[in-house]
Amino acid sequence: MKLEAVTFDVTHTLLSCPTLGQQYADVLARHGIEVAARDIEAAIPLVWQELACSASPARDRFLHHANGARGFWRHFVERTCELVDAARPSAFAAAELFDRFAQAAAWEVAPGTRGMLADLRRRGLRLAVISNWDQRLPLLLERLELADHFDTFAISAIVGAEKPHPRIFETALAALGVAAEHALHVGYSRRDDVEGARGVGMQALLLSPAGDGDLRSLAELPARLFGDRQQTG
């Protein structure tokens, strides 16, 4: 089957944030809340999953919140602090964190990503992002100088549905003008990325640096798809 398009998850796939807990701890400390970065780091995925349970994937968590994305993230920060027995953060602390993670300096682009994306574009593939993110994502990708690699962005807060719901994948496919069987999705979550993509008829590859997936890094993708060793730097 001819491959015409590749779509990508964002967090833990295109981007990483190895200092996530420390960034939270630094901001909270400026607002009078002392908490260990390692405790925040451990709590964040638990809170993300907990808050996901309050909304069906057919209803994006950011749109689902009465006060939108900022309201969701304020709730997120408050719940994270509660989980680590820290004081309740102010609205100013939550706002500073919200603004910080819209900046390029808060993130790292995964090694090999830029070269890999350029390689796929040279081969004539259409590219898209499919991500459970809020409306800040397009600007963030611009600031990271990644946006120009992509033909379209399917973002849950704009589409109104989260992965693994079919609607977010179908939105990307429609924008790309590509049938599901001619598209591949790459992401780190078996449920959201692999099962979600396959559920609409796309191919899917699981990214796992630990080695229990299909790819250890995005730099391996061109060789996996085309059987060559072209440098993706």
Model-found features: residue ranges?
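N-terminal helical cap/lid subdomain that shapes the substrate entry/recognition surface
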Residues: 1-114, 122-123
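Asp-based, Mg2+/Mn2+-dependent phosphohydrolase catalytic module
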Residues: 1-6, 38, 87-93, 108, ...
